[in-house]
C-alpha cells in the first residue's frame, strides 16, 4: 500500500493548483533600462498585464495556456525593446502597444505574437520607427489586427486554418507580408498617404473561398498578390505615383479587380483555370507640384 507523507501531499496539492488555476490576475510594471518582465499562466479565465516605461533594451514576455485568457503588453517611451506573447487554447485575447515618446525617439522595437487554437483575437499597435513585427495564428475563426504606422517597418502575418481574418495598416516606407492557408479567409492591407512612399505588400492565399483586398495610397508602392484555390476574390486599389501591381491566380471561378488612379503605374496579372474574371481599370492621376 502506497503511503503519502504530509509534505508530499502538500507538494501534490500545490502542483495541482498551478496546473488547473483559473481566474488569476498578474500585473508587472517596470521603469528603467535593461529590464526583463515575464509572466506565465496555466488555466482558464486568466489575465496578464505587463507595462514597461521609459526603457531601453527591455524584454517583455507573456505565456498563457488555457481558454478565455487575456494578455496585454505596453512598452512606452523607449527604444530597442522586444515584446512577445504566446497563447495556446481557445477564445484568448492578446494586445501589444508600442508607442513613441514625445520626441519620437523610439526605434528598433521587436514585436512577436503566436496563438494556437480557435476563436482567438490579436491586436497590435506599433508607432515606433524601424520596428519588426511578427504575428501568427493556427486554428479557425481567429482574428489578427495590426497598426504598424511608425515608418520604415516590416510586418509578417501568417494564419493557418479556416474562417480567419487579417487587417493591417502600414506607415510610410514599410513592408507587409501576409500569408493565409485554409478556406473562407479574409485579408486586408492598407498603405500610407500619397506623400509618403515606397510601401510594399506581398499577399498570398492558399485555399477556397478566400478574399483579399489591399489599398496602396503611397507613391512608388508595390503590391504582389498570389491566390491558389477555387472561388477566391481579390480587390486591389492604388493611387499615387509609379505604383506597380502584379500577381497570379490558379484555380477556377476566381475574380480579380484592379483599380489604379496613378501616374506611370503598371499592372501585370495572370490567371490559370476556368471561369475566372480579371478586371483592370487605370486612370491617370494629375498632380500639381508645390
Residue ranges and their predicted role:
Residues 16-18:
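N-terminal signal peptide c-region/cleavage motif recognized by signal peptidases
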